């Protein structure tokens, strides 16, 4: 599924050379649910951006579904992002002027899916997250928890190989956070691979495996023995 080996990412500002990721290697199998943890500046978000094909590494290799994506062109990476990866962000990243349904359809618009099929698949994705009664609402007419459910529906509408969630409960209250984690656990139980960045221990305990970063390196990688089921 996902295999990175000795990946390196550095940023240079003036005379300062900052190593954000230092020879990181990790393998994620199909169907896993992994929580990526670490303090601010540990490299966890940089790692998520690299495996999400949103950024480029300075060294090492990255295989996604058996394909080496380490040195692909920008248009090739964009195609992989749209086809293979479903993103869920802390800030939801919904377009405010269009409806919930149209927001969920967006990845398929970029993929050239015909309008009728777009609508059918978007409605199916919204049904999975329990939002079929909000399809014609705009983002400013729904709650934060509902916005994140729309974002999840958008992430799964293309049946991606992996769902990548960056602090998906960071802007939510406890009740909404539980609702979101229930959805992620359900999707994972149905076979989806989920990689989630979080700083919350309670949220991390809902995953099956935790990988901890510090100073650009992995310092911990373990299976959760007593998983929290929401």
Please tell me what each predicted stretch does.
Residues 209, 217-230:
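Conserved beta-strand-loop-alpha-helix hinge in the C-terminal portion
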Residues 1-213:
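ABC family nucleotide-binding domain
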């Amino acid at each position: 599924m996902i295999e990175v080996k000795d990946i390196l990412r550095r940023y240079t500002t003036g005379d300062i050379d900052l190593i954000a990721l230092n020879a990181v290697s990790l393998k994620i199998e199909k169907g896993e649910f992994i929580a990526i943890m670490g303090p601010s500046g540990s490299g966890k978000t940089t790692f998520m951006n690299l495996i999400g094909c949103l950024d480029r590494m300075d060294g090492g290799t990255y295989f996604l579904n058996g394909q080496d994506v380490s040195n692909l062109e920008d248009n090739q990476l964009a195609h992989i992002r749209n086809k293979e990866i479903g993103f869920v962000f802390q800030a939801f990243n919904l377009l405010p002027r269009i409806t919930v349904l149209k927001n969920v359809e967006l990845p398929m618009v970029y993929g050239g899916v015909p309008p009728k099929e777009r609508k059918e698949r978007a409605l199916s994705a919204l049904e999975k997250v329990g939002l079929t009664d909000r399809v014609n609402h705009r983002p400013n007419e729904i709650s934060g928890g509902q916005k994140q459910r729309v974002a999840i529906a958008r992430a799964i509408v293309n049946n991606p190989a992996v769902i990548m969630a960056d602090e998906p409960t960071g802007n939510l209250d406890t009740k909404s956070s539980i609702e979101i984690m229930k959805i992620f656990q359900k999707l994972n139980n149905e076979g989806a691979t989920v990689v989630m960045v979080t700083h919350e221990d309670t949220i991390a305990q809902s995953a099956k495996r935790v990988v901890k970063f510090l100073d650009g390196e992995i310092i911990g990688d373990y299976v959760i023995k007593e998983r929290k089921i929401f």
